[in-house]
């Protein structure tokens, strides 16, 4: 079976390669490499505040140390229930740095959906903001994997 029959959309690709060879690195390692190369460049801007790669790496490293101090480590699953904000980014990359597995869910999910996601992922911990804590806390006693 040729590429055209298994992926017919490829015939519409002009100069776009059908396959990319990605480096064998974690997403944390990729961001770290960018930070090492461009420490003063802006990593992201949130609500008008610009954060450089150097600052971003400091935040990630501090967050990773905090996770380790809480006993979260390699292979642990952690749900991030936050909007798109710096704390979500810090947590995502910090968890990747220590070898934990993060899964991100929408904080506007219904309580029943949050329970489903936590049970399905077998998360060891969940991270959220105070605005969403009540909804998250309401499902904790019902979880299969406590």
Descriptions of predicted regions:
Residues 21-23, 30-32, 40-85, 89-93, ...:
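Conserved AMP-binding/adenylate-forming core of the ANL superfamily
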Residues 5, 35-40:
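A short, compositionally biased
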Residues 10, 86, 103-105:
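Generic secondary-structure boundary/loop-capping signal
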Residues 27, 45, 126-128:
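Conserved, well-structured beta-alpha core segment at the onset of a catalytic domain
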Residues 70, 97-146:
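Structural core segment of the AMP-binding/adenylate-forming
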Residues 1-24:
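Flexible, non-catalytic linker and terminal segments flanking ANL/adenylate-forming cores
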Residues 17, 43, 49, 100, ...:
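A broad detector of the eukaryotic-type serine/threonine protein kinase catalytic domain
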